[in-house]
């Protein structure tokens, strides 16, 4: 057995199965397409489910892939052990009703013994206890020693996940120190002790499990295999853990270099080193697939990984942001198989750095708060942190609850998760595990996706808005029907159509379907998972039946407006690259007949000057009346010509390229104007951030742009009338009014201070003494926080010894301040505790130091009640 690098193993595997007539497909995105059962792709076969279930026709009956995967179900074990990781690559070869056991078993043996040259006396095979067919093939079609084959039960060697396709499996294992194993019991024991490790699972999908629990034989059985690349690399490189594999160790070494720590010298530091090494791999690949840090879904998974890694960097003594620098090592070791990493290198680094900086801004304050909570819990001899406090750390300081749990676990403290989840409300969906579905293999198994794959629905709408066709499918009330009549709503599928189905951010067409005896309104148009065009209709008159001849007619005015907005989106994209920078990449868009929305990568607000320049460029290109051309070409040719591709899309070999003169060239399947001049006019109406590193521009075109400008002009005219000036004088008039208003506000504030000063004497005259401590408390009217603090300072200084607590109702909000002299603090007075109790009554909260604290409240009606509690609280604190 010769040592092989991880990248070499991957290439040898894919090449081997290409030689067996398999189509090599690139890894799919980590973001699942048309699969609500998963947050992230977590297995090699996951993106291929539509092929296994018959919802889509595979590009070839034999396929091989190396799929990037992320699993976070056992993230708490990552780092603590050297076996667990969140990111891994799964090599696989798949048969969709083509070859079966008699082919894959000899191929598997050939690959591991002749290509990888694994010693046969180190290999073991397991089969399902009843699978005599597999045993016969292993014994008679390979030269494996029959004594090294063991039958195991359903738990070990039968693959199923809920209902649907399932079947027995055969696993291949490597001996890592078990010695000779003679029985299945000895084999299981050695496996549990990691002395024998499984590295390849051959799944024979030959049954379909129904709701009654019956296993029905499939007419066309499938093959689904999975070999973990990193695990295979540990065997081929004779290392004990994935962290010692060549490409991963390169990252680990960089972590050690940045931190000054040495691996395998300190158990606690080793945990942090492994966590960072693993997480940066997941982080890099997730961002390359368009995922951005957020507080929900897969974005939350990313944020959790990133902040967990950043926190462990601080544990290692790394003071500055550092994760973005590790990305280079990940990319250098992976880009040949994942070229998108190199293409998006700078973007990935910017997203990571921005999120690190945001976490840096809050982590120190958050850790201080958490340490205070830990002390409080321990001082009270408790073992649980309340859910509301854990939520405050999450909401205010950006601490993922799992990070808080991890830190608390080190202190022997847990979280009140029920209380935390109650606080979370709308953010209940966590990243601990993917959403569960009963039917794993058929998560999109709706009636719309059961349309016969042999029915073709050709789109003719690029150059036609009206076509004749026949009705191929009718669906009503989630059932296939022979017909529909007036008043019914459902779905009609025809053999050809001019209707554009919603896709690529462009809304679906509307219009009518009719003949002499019926008429239906098309209210929406979408595609099912296999690409069939679905016309969502309401029958206005008559009846329609299968195979009826019909005419399909698109709403022309609406389609034309959509075309204008879609072409304008392309020009906008090119203009943004020109003005803002070539780092700009589309991360989403939405185009309908009213407006367009364009999301793009950028790390700060686009300035007013930049927006003006972008708008100017777009309108200039519109006025040039450039020809808009479309051409179908090879994907590589399109890229060579500089055509822009969407961030995370997978494209076929032949793609449609849309060009607007020499200014814009993009891969696009949408509908467009034939000449940029048809857009007429372009106007940006808003620019805002929608996520970390993502900005959004909304704009209108043609008559909608004119309406927008008219509306703005009318506002100017009305404002000029109110201020009794003409429009040219409006700015000067407004500036004058603002200056006057500021002067009046200063006068008002001065009067309020006078009133507050007048209240000072009254408060000093009403000082009470509690357990030897002077207490001054009062509610004062309508003064802001600064004035309230000034008044508190004066009263405290005047008292020389004591505590003062003041509250104010200012513009509908309640403000509190508490101050104490040093001698009263020594007696037990704590302003932070006083203010917290008092503010709670007014629906607020806050805290602070023993000698000074402030807070806010939500209910002005409770201000007097809150102030009345001051004496009771002080009495409870004074020793």
Curated annotation (Swiss-Prot):
ATP-binding is among the record's keywords: yes
Binding site for Zn(2+): 566, 570, 668, 672
Keywords: Aminoacyl-tRNA synthetase, ATP-binding, Cytoplasm, Ligase, Metal-binding, Nucleotide-binding, Protein biosynthesis, RNA-binding, tRNA-binding, Zinc
Name of the protein in its database record: Alanine--tRNA ligase
EC number from the UniProt entry: 6.1.1.7
Enzyme class: ligase
Family note: Belongs to the class-II aminoacyl-tRNA synthetase family.
Example GO biological process: alanyl-tRNA aminoacylation
GO CC terms: cytosol
Localization annotation: Cytoplasm
């Amino acid at each position: 057995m010769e040592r092989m690098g991880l990248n070499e193993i991957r290439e040898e595997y894919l090449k081997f199965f290409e030689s067996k007539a398999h189509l090599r497909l690139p890894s799919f995105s980590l973001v699942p397409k048309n699969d609500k059962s998963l947050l992230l792709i977590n297995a090699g076969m996951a993106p291929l489910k539509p092929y296994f279930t018959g919802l889509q026709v595979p590009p070839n009956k034999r396929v091989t892939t190396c799929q990037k995967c992320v699993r976070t179900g056992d993230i708490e074990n990552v780092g603590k052990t050297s076996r667990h990781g969140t990111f891994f690559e799964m090599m696989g070869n798949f048969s969709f009703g083509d070859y079966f056991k008699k082919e894959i078993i000899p191929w598997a043996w050939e690959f591991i013994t002749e290509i990888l040259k694994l010693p046969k006396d180190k290999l073991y095979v397991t089969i399902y206890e009843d699978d005599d067919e597999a045993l016969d093939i292993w014994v008679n079609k390979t030269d494996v020693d029959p004594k090294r084959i063991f039958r195991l039960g359903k738990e070990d060697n039968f693959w199923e996940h809920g209902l649907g396709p399932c079947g027995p499996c055969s696993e291949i294992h490597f001996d890592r120190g078990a010695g000779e194993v003679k029985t299945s019991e000895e084999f299981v024991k050695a496996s549990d002790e990691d002395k024998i490790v499984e590295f390849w699972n051959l799944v024979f999908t030959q049954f379909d499990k129904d709701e009654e629990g019956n296993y029905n034989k499939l007419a066309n059985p499938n093959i689904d295999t999975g070999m973990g690349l990193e695990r295979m690399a540990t065997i081929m490189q004779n290392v004990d853990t994935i962290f010692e594999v060549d490409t991963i160790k390169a990252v680990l070494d960089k972590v050690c270099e940045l931190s000054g720590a040495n691996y395998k010298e300190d158990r606690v530091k080793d945990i942090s080193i492994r966590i960072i090494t693993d997480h940066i791999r997941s982080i890099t690949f997730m961002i390359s697939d368009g995922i951005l840090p957020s507080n929900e879904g897969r974005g939350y998974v990313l944020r959790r990984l990133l902040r967990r890694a950043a926190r462990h960097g601080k544990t290692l003594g790394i003071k500055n942001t550092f994760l973005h620098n590790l990305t280079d090592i990940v990319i250098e070791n992976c880009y040949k198989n994942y070229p998108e990493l190199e293409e998006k290198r700078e973007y990935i680094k910017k997203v990571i750095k921005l999120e690190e900086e945001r976490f840096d801004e809050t982590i120190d304050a958050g850790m201080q708060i958490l340490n205070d909570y830990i002390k409080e819990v321990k001082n009270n001899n408790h073992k649980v942190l309340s859910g509301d406090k854990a939520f405050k750390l999450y909401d205010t300081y950006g601490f993922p609850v799992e990070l808080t749990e991890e830190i608390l676990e080190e202190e022997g403290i847990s979280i009140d998760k029920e209380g935390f989840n109650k606080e979370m409300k709308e953010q209940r969906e966590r990243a601990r595990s993917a959403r569960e579905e009963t039917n794993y293999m058929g998560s999109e198994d709706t009636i719309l996706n059961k349309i016969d794959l042999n029915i073709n629905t050709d789109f003719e709408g690029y150059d036609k808005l009206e076509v004749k066709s026949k009705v191929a499918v009718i669906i009503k009330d989630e059932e296939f029907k022979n017909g529909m009549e007036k008043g019914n709503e459902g779905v009609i599928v025809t053999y050809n159509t001019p209707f554009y189905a919603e896709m690529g951010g462009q809304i679906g067409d509307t219009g009518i379907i009719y003949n002499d005896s019926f008429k239906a309104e098309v209210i929406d148009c979408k595609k099912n998972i296999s690409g069939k065009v679905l016309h969502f209709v309401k029958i206005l008159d008559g009846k329609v039946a299968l195979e009826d001849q019909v005419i399909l007619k698109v709403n022309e005015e609406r389609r034309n407006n959509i075309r204008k907005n879609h072409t304008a989106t392309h020009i906008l994209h090119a203009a943004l690259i020109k003005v803002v920078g070539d780092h700009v990449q589309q991360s989403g868009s939405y185009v309908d007949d009213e407006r367009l929305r364009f999301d793009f990568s950028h790390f700060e607000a686009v300035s007013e000057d930049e927006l003006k320049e972008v708008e100017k460029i777009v309108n200039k290109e519109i006025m040039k009346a450039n020809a808009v051309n479309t051409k179908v070409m090879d994907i590589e040719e399109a890229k060579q010509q500089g055509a822009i591709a969407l961030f995370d899309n997978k494209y076929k070999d032949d793609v449609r390229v849309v060009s607007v003169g020499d200014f814009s060239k993009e891969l696009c399947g949408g509908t467009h104007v034939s000449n940029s001049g048809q857009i007429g006019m372009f106007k940006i109406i808003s620019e805002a951030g929608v996520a970390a590193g993502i900005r959004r521009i909304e704009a209108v075109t043609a008559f909608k742009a004119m309406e927008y400008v008219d509306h703005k002009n009318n506002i100017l005219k009305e404002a000029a009338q109110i201020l009794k000036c003409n429009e040219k004088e409006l700015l000067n008039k407004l500036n004058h009014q603002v200056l006057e208003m500021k002067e009046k506000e200063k006068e008002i504030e001065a009067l309020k201070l006078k009133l507050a000063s007048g209240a000072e004497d009254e408060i000093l005259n009403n000082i009470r003494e509690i357990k030897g401590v002077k207490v001054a408390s009062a509610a004062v009217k309508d003064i802001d926080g600064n004035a309230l603090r000034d008044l508190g300072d004066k009263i405290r200084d005047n008292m020389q010894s004591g505590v003062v607590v003041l509250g104010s109702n200012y513009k509908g909000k309640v403000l509190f301040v508490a101050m104490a002299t040093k001698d009263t603090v020594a007696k037990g007075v704590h302003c932070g505790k006083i203010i917290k109790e008092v503010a709670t009554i007014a629906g607020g909260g806050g805290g602070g130091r023993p000698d000074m604290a402030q807070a806010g409240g939500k209910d002005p009606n409770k201000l007097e009640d809150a102030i009345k509690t001051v004496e009771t609280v002080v009495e409870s604190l004074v020793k």
